[in-house]
Protein backbone atom coordinates (compact mmCIF):
# COMPACT_ATOMS: atom_id res chain seq x y z
CA UNK A 1 0.00 0.00 0.00
CA UNK A 2 1.07 3.56 -0.60
CA UNK A 3 -0.11 7.00 0.35
CA UNK A 4 -0.86 8.96 -2.82
CA UNK A 5 -0.72 12.72 -3.29
CA UNK A 6 -4.15 14.32 -3.11
CA UNK A 7 -4.74 16.86 -5.88
CA UNK A 8 -5.75 20.36 -4.80
CA UNK A 9 -8.55 22.56 -6.07
CA UNK A 10 -6.34 25.64 -5.69
CA UNK A 11 -3.58 24.27 -7.99
CA UNK A 12 -4.24 25.04 -11.69
CA UNK A 13 -2.80 21.75 -13.04
CA UNK A 14 -4.53 19.64 -10.38
CA UNK A 15 -7.80 21.45 -11.01
CA UNK A 16 -7.75 20.39 -14.68
CA UNK A 17 -7.84 16.75 -13.60
CA UNK A 18 -10.37 17.37 -10.82
CA UNK A 19 -12.72 19.01 -13.34
CA UNK A 20 -12.64 16.05 -15.77
CA UNK A 21 -15.62 13.81 -16.46
CA UNK A 22 -14.29 10.41 -15.35
CA UNK A 23 -14.44 7.35 -17.56
CA UNK A 24 -16.24 4.16 -16.46
CA UNK A 25 -14.18 1.33 -15.01
CA UNK A 26 -14.06 -1.88 -17.05
CA UNK A 27 -14.25 -4.90 -14.77
CA UNK A 28 -12.57 -7.13 -13.91
CA UNK A 29 -9.38 -5.12 -13.42
CA UNK A 30 -6.47 -6.80 -11.63
CA UNK A 31 -4.89 -3.48 -10.64
CA UNK A 32 -7.99 -2.09 -8.96
CA UNK A 33 -7.57 -3.93 -5.65
CA UNK A 34 -4.17 -2.30 -5.06
CA UNK A 35 -5.50 1.10 -6.11
CA UNK A 36 -8.40 0.77 -3.64
CA UNK A 37 -5.97 -0.21 -0.85
CA UNK A 38 -3.84 2.85 -1.66
CA UNK A 39 -6.94 5.05 -1.65
CA UNK A 40 -8.01 3.84 1.80
CA UNK A 41 -4.49 4.39 3.15
CA UNK A 42 -4.40 7.88 1.61
CA UNK A 43 -7.85 8.77 2.96
CA UNK A 44 -7.00 7.54 6.47
CA UNK A 45 -3.71 9.49 6.48
CA UNK A 46 -5.66 12.65 5.58
CA UNK A 47 -8.39 11.96 8.17
CA UNK A 48 -11.06 11.82 5.48
CA UNK A 49 -14.40 10.08 5.14
CA UNK A 50 -14.30 9.66 1.36
CA UNK A 51 -11.94 9.84 -1.59
CA UNK A 52 -12.54 9.71 -5.34
CA UNK A 53 -9.99 8.37 -7.82
CA UNK A 54 -9.64 11.72 -9.64
CA UNK A 55 -8.48 13.24 -6.35
CA UNK A 56 -5.32 11.17 -6.70
CA UNK A 57 -4.98 11.89 -10.42
CA UNK A 58 -6.83 8.89 -11.87
CA UNK A 59 -9.93 9.99 -13.83
CA UNK A 60 -12.02 6.82 -13.44
CA UNK A 61 -15.42 6.26 -11.84
CA UNK A 62 -14.23 4.88 -8.51
CA UNK A 63 -14.69 6.25 -5.03
CA UNK A 64 -14.35 4.97 -1.49
CA UNK A 65 -16.16 5.96 1.67
CA UNK A 66 -15.63 4.91 5.26
CA UNK A 67 -18.03 6.11 7.90
CA UNK A 68 -16.21 6.25 11.26
CA UNK A 69 -17.36 3.93 14.05
CA UNK A 70 -19.79 5.19 16.67
CA UNK A 71 -19.18 4.67 20.37
CA UNK A 72 -21.45 4.82 23.39
CA UNK A 73 -20.21 5.83 26.82
CA UNK A 74 -20.95 3.36 29.58
CA UNK A 75 -21.80 4.27 33.20
CA UNK A 76 -18.20 3.45 34.22
CA UNK A 77 -16.86 5.92 31.63
CA UNK A 78 -15.64 3.27 29.20
CA UNK A 79 -16.67 3.31 25.55
CA UNK A 80 -18.16 0.47 23.57
CA UNK A 81 -18.45 0.39 19.81
CA UNK A 82 -22.14 0.42 18.84
CA UNK A 83 -21.68 0.86 15.07
CA UNK A 84 -18.44 -0.37 13.48
CA UNK A 85 -16.67 1.54 10.70
CA UNK A 86 -18.38 0.97 7.36
CA UNK A 87 -16.03 0.90 4.35
CA UNK A 88 -17.59 1.18 0.87
CA UNK A 89 -15.99 0.77 -2.55
CA UNK A 90 -18.22 2.22 -5.26
CA UNK A 91 -17.29 1.49 -8.86
CA UNK A 92 -19.26 3.19 -11.65
CA UNK A 93 -21.74 4.63 -9.12
CA UNK A 94 -24.96 6.24 -10.26
CA UNK A 95 -27.40 8.08 -8.05
CA UNK A 96 -30.74 6.73 -9.29
CA UNK A 97 -33.16 8.28 -6.81
CA UNK A 98 -33.14 11.21 -4.39
CA UNK A 99 -35.34 12.39 -1.56
CA UNK A 100 -36.37 15.55 -3.37
CA UNK A 101 -35.66 17.43 -0.13
CA UNK A 102 -32.47 19.40 0.46
CA UNK A 103 -30.63 20.09 3.67
CA UNK A 104 -27.71 22.45 4.10
CA UNK A 105 -24.56 20.81 5.41
CA UNK A 106 -21.20 22.22 6.37
CA UNK A 107 -18.93 20.48 3.90
CA UNK A 108 -15.21 20.21 3.28
CA UNK A 109 -12.95 18.32 0.88
CA UNK A 110 -9.54 16.67 1.05
CA UNK A 111 -8.69 18.58 -2.15
CA UNK A 112 -9.11 21.89 -0.30
CA UNK A 113 -7.89 21.10 3.21
CA UNK A 114 -9.15 23.28 6.02
CA UNK A 115 -11.90 24.97 3.99
CA UNK A 116 -15.60 24.45 4.67
CA UNK A 117 -18.83 25.90 3.32
CA UNK A 118 -22.57 25.30 3.49
CA UNK A 119 -23.64 22.98 0.66
CA UNK A 120 -27.18 21.86 -0.19
CA UNK A 121 -27.52 18.07 -0.41
CA UNK A 122 -30.42 15.66 -0.73
CA UNK A 123 -31.56 14.19 2.61
CA UNK A 124 -31.12 10.70 1.14
CA UNK A 125 -30.05 9.04 -2.10
CA UNK A 126 -30.28 5.61 -3.68
CA UNK A 127 -27.11 4.63 -5.51
CA UNK A 128 -26.29 1.75 -7.85
CA UNK A 129 -22.68 0.64 -8.18
CA UNK A 130 -20.38 -2.31 -8.76
CA UNK A 131 -17.94 -3.88 -6.33
CA UNK A 132 -14.39 -5.06 -7.08
CA UNK A 133 -15.66 -8.37 -8.50
CA UNK A 134 -18.05 -6.55 -10.84
CA UNK A 135 -21.19 -7.51 -8.92
CA UNK A 136 -23.98 -4.92 -9.10
CA UNK A 137 -25.42 -3.44 -5.89
CA UNK A 138 -28.13 -0.97 -4.95
CA UNK A 139 -27.85 0.97 -1.70
CA UNK A 140 -31.29 2.34 -0.89
CA UNK A 141 -32.03 5.58 0.91
CA UNK A 142 -28.51 6.29 2.16
CA UNK A 143 -28.82 9.24 4.52
CA UNK A 144 -26.81 11.11 7.13
CA UNK A 145 -23.05 11.16 6.69
CA UNK A 146 -23.14 8.24 4.23
CA UNK A 147 -25.69 9.92 1.96
CA UNK A 148 -23.78 13.20 2.06
CA UNK A 149 -20.45 11.46 1.30
CA UNK A 150 -21.94 9.53 -1.63
CA UNK A 151 -23.22 12.77 -3.19
CA UNK A 152 -19.87 14.53 -2.63
CA UNK A 153 -17.76 11.68 -4.08
CA UNK A 154 -20.07 11.06 -7.06
CA UNK A 155 -19.81 14.79 -7.82
CA UNK A 156 -16.02 14.36 -8.04
CA UNK A 157 -16.50 11.66 -10.70
CA UNK A 158 -18.38 14.21 -12.81
CA UNK A 159 -15.85 17.02 -12.32
CA UNK A 160 -18.03 18.91 -9.83
CA UNK A 161 -16.27 20.43 -6.82
CA UNK A 162 -18.04 21.15 -3.53
CA UNK A 163 -17.20 24.85 -3.88
CA UNK A 164 -19.40 24.94 -7.01
CA UNK A 165 -22.39 23.74 -4.98
CA UNK A 166 -22.11 26.53 -2.40
CA UNK A 167 -24.97 29.00 -2.89
CA UNK A 168 -23.75 31.60 -0.39
CA UNK A 169 -20.00 32.07 -0.79
CA UNK A 170 -19.88 33.99 2.50
CA UNK A 171 -20.18 30.55 4.20
CA UNK A 172 -16.87 29.40 2.65
CA UNK A 173 -14.20 29.76 5.31
CA UNK A 174 -10.77 28.52 6.31
CA UNK A 175 -11.24 26.77 9.66
CA UNK A 176 -7.50 26.61 10.26
CA UNK A 177 -7.54 30.41 10.60
CA UNK A 178 -10.56 30.17 12.91
CA UNK A 179 -8.64 27.74 15.12
CA UNK A 180 -5.54 29.98 15.14
CA UNK A 181 -7.67 32.97 16.19
CA UNK A 182 -9.07 31.18 19.23
CA UNK A 183 -7.38 32.12 22.52
CA UNK A 184 -5.17 29.45 24.02
CA UNK A 185 -5.70 28.67 27.68
CA UNK A 186 -2.61 28.63 29.84
CA UNK A 187 -1.73 25.20 31.18
CA UNK A 188 -0.54 24.88 34.76
Swiss-Prot record:
Disulfide bonds: none annotated. CDD domains: Pep_deformylase. It catalyses: N-terminal N-formyl-L-methionyl-[peptide] + H2O = N-terminal L-methionyl-[peptide] + formate. GO terms for molecular function: metal ion binding; peptide deformylase activity. Binds 1 Fe(2+) ion. Fe cation binds at residues 109, 152, 156. Keywords: Hydrolase, Iron, Metal-binding, Protein biosynthesis. Gene3D superfamilies: Peptide deformylase. Its EC number is 3.5.1.88. GO terms for biological process: co-translational protein modification; translation. The keyword Iron applies. Coiled coil: none annotated. The keyword Lipoprotein does not apply. Its cofactor is Fe(2+). It comes from the Bacteria. Removes the formyl group from the N-terminal Met of newly synthesized proteins. Requires at least a dipeptide for an efficient rate of reaction. N-terminal L-methionine is a prerequisite for activity but the enzyme has broad specificity at other positions. This is Peptide deformylase. It comes from Chloroflexus aggregans (strain MD-66 / DSM 9485).
Amino acid sequence: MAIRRILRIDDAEDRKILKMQCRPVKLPDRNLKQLVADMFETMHAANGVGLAAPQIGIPIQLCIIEIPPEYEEQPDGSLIEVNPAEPYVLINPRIVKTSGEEIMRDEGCLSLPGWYGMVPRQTWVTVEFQDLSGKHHRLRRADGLLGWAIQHEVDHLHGILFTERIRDLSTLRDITKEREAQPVEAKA
